Amino acid sequence: MEKKRLHAIYITAISVLGVTALSLGAALIATNLPESPKSGMEQYYDEKVAAFGMENSNFSRGQIVFIGDSITDLYPLGDYYSDLDLMTYNRGISGDTTKGVLKRMDVSLYAIQPTKVVLMIGINDINGGVPFKETSNNYKAILDGIKTNLPNTVTYCMSILPMSDKILEVAQVDIPGQNQKVREMNEEIKPIIADHGYTYLDLYSLVQDENQKLRNELTDDGIHLNSNGFAIWTNLVKPYLM
């Protein structure tokens, strides 16, 4: 059952990689396009948010929540964190953006009052051409919300991750250009995180190759982590969750 669930998430996540060309030759992930491909992702978003609401009545307060996009959605937390004293809840939604996370803070976080939050969000903003200022403002608003509504919650903010050339098998993407934007956005969010008293965890540096791309052995499609990549993420963040 778990394998089927993860397969469904993976297929949904891959559908985000349909692209359209921009005048400068950059590519957009279809999640962020205003045409019909977005409707499927919007439906998935709505279904996930509704599912979170149903889960909340059965979830314990004071646990750990991972929140983000498809990289989080695909992360089988039970395989890596079952030995912790606290439960880990996955609030990732494939194709999500900073705007999407901001819209669902109540159901994803506030309702279950976690003591620790692990946030990774922003790659779909970058690949969708969202202006940096808008993304950073949304990111700040997310952290503002946590600070106001969950004042005692410890928050760990993961770096946005690079892509690898494997993505070129399904989409025409300017990998060096997009990865440069990822690095710039990571620099943009660092002071925001620090200003809130939260912890920035640099996973990018641990998964990059000599060309600052996602190492091919850590991904099957060029953007999402596989089990090798999840192991590195786990090794980085788990000591903070003990």
Identify the residue ranges that each predicted region occupies.
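Catalytic His-Asp segment of secreted/periplasmic serine-dependent ester chemistry enzymes
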Residues: 164-242
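Charged helix-capping and loop-helix junction motifs
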Residues: 132-142, 182
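Cell-envelope and extracellular/periplasmic
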Residues: 92-94, 121-126
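Generic structural signal for well-ordered alpha-helices
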Residues: 105, 139-143, 186
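N-terminal Sec-pathway targeting helices
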Residues: 1-20
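Serine-esterase "nucleophile elbow" of acetyl-processing enzymes
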Residues: 19, 23-113
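Active-site segments of SGNH/GDSL-like serine hydrolases
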Residues: 123-126, 144-182
